[in-house]
A protein has these predicted regions:
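Rossmann-like AdoMet
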Residues: 2-96, 100-161
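A short SAM/SAH-binding and catalytic strip from SAM-dependent methyltransferases
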Residues: 156-173
Length: 173
């Protein structure tokens, strides 16, 4: 059966081979087995090799897939509007896996225009490459006072917080 998908380039095949070798090395170093969670961590985030860490564009028309935030601001505006309606004044917004930063940009612009910004907007992003892209996008797109509310997390908050946890497409990954 033939596939309608394009064949990977020689460069893509070589990259895939390097990632496979890295994962094999990790399995060997662990005595022959690793948990599935570790396998997924390596496949997605191994520095310079993982799907989200190798520098290739993943989102939008030139990427591998398109999510609602990449199509325009409406989705983020609807979510932000509802979050503000439910939580009112001071709250924290935590986004898991911020992708290109499109959702954060649209949500923060929308809330800023209504004088309804969260106390903090945090993005939990394991990919250093995506983190850098998000920072660049948001720094350029948002007024400094809005950008200064944005921060990046290395893990879930360890203390209690009042706010909203948003995870678009995370379960799919």
């Amino acid at each position: 059966m033939s596939s309608p998908l394009p064949a990977p380039s020689a460069e893509a095949l070589a990259h895939s081979g390097r990632l496979q070798a890295h994962i094999r090395d990790q399995v060997r170093a662990a005595g022959g087995a690793i948990p599935f969670s570790r396998y997924m961590e390596l496949a997605l985030y191994a520095p310079g090799l993982g799907y989200y860490s190798a520098g290739a564009r993943k989102f939008g028309a030139e990427g591998d897939f398109v999510t609602a935030p990449e199509l325009g601001p409406v989705f983020a505006e609807c979510v932000a509007s509802d979050v503000f309606a439910q939580l009112g004044g001071r709250f924290d917004f935590i986004e898991l896996g911020g992708g290109s930063g499109a959702f954060a940009e649209a949500a923060l612009r929308f809330l800023h225009a209504r004088d309804a910004l969260p106390a903090h907007y945090r993005i939990l992003e394991p990919s250093a490459d995506l983190r850098e892209r998000q920072m660049e996008r948001l720094r350029e797109a948002l007024p400094p006072a809005v950008f200064n509310r944005v921060g990046w997390l290395d893990g879930p908050p360890e203390r209690g917080w009042r706010g909203f946890l948003f995870a678009n497409e995370v379960i799919d990954a």
